[in-house]
Amino acid sequence: MLLRGVNDSADALEALFRAMLAARVKPYYLHQLDAAPGTARFHVPIAEGQRLLASLRGRVTGLAWPTYILDIPGGHGKVPIGPGYLNTDGTVRGPDGRYYSAGSSL
């Protein structure tokens, strides 16, 4: 669960994911906080969560890379909301934040 003031920094998430791996637990999901009464102070906007997760690319191994998800209100299931790297114009965003042509890979 991504929580404001608890684990809403790249350093905190990196330490958490590394500690989980050291305990032989794969960080499978990073949940976006559900909108519920009394939780507003812990809310991290989705765009900020995406930026945080993207900033960990290259800092942690793929095993420590969870799927950032949103549990759709109303019981409609979970959907991945992680950072997007492939753009509709055929470019990809690299770990350095710059954009490159995906070339013939599309």
Language-model regions, residue ranges each:
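Auxiliary Fe-S-binding modules of radical SAM enzymes
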Residues: 21-106
